[in-house]
């Protein structure tokens, strides 16, 4: 089996739970066809660089996949049919990177920097 990284962009008007459900559908589809998803990352609702099908934002997800080519082809076929999916891209990689992706690592780092500020700097409103 080969290793793949797969990014899916779903429409902005679906809920985060529906985007997560889409990821679970992809996981079930790949496992039915002899594949395995090693990692699923939901990147959240992000701005698109340009409008796609009248959408300015999209729910991004990254999947690290270990599956045969036929399973990946079937997954892509199902994504083409799904109306909630704006775009997707699958690339073949030499090995799966199971660490946190740079997108999530940066977001966690930024959240960590914000929370380090001491709380006693705030003066009460007079």
Curated annotation (Swiss-Prot):
* Cellular component aspect of the GO annotation: cytosolic small ribosomal subunit
Q: Which InterPro entries match?
A: Ribosomal_bS6, Ribosomal_bS6_sf, Ribosomal_S6_plastid/chlpt, Transl_elong_EF1B/ribsomal_bS6
Q: Please provide the Gene Ontology terms (biological process) for this protein.
A: translation
Determine the domain of life of the protein's source. Bacteria
- Which is one Pfam family of this protein? Ribosomal_S6
Q: Which GO terms describe its molecular function?
A: small ribosomal subunit rRNA binding; structural constituent of ribosome
Q: Does DNA-binding count among this protein's keywords?
A: no
User: Per the record, which residues fall in region Disordered?
Assistant: 107-126
Which of UniProt's keywords are assigned here?
Ribonucleoprotein, Ribosomal protein, RNA-binding, rRNA-binding
Homology family: Belongs to the bacterial ribosomal protein bS6 family.
Briefly, what is this protein's role? Binds together with bS18 to 16S ribosomal RNA.
Q: By its UniProt entry, which HAMAP family does this protein fall under?
A: Ribosomal_bS6 (MF_00360)
Q: Supply the PANTHER family for this chain.
A: MITOCHONDRIAL 28S RIBOSOMAL PROTEIN S6, SMALL RIBOSOMAL SUBUNIT PROTEIN BS6M
Return the protein name. Small ribosomal subunit protein bS6
Organism in which the protein naturally occurs: Caulobacter sp. (strain K31)
Lineage per the UniProt record = Bacteria, Pseudomonadati, Pseudomonadota, Alphaproteobacteria, Caulobacterales
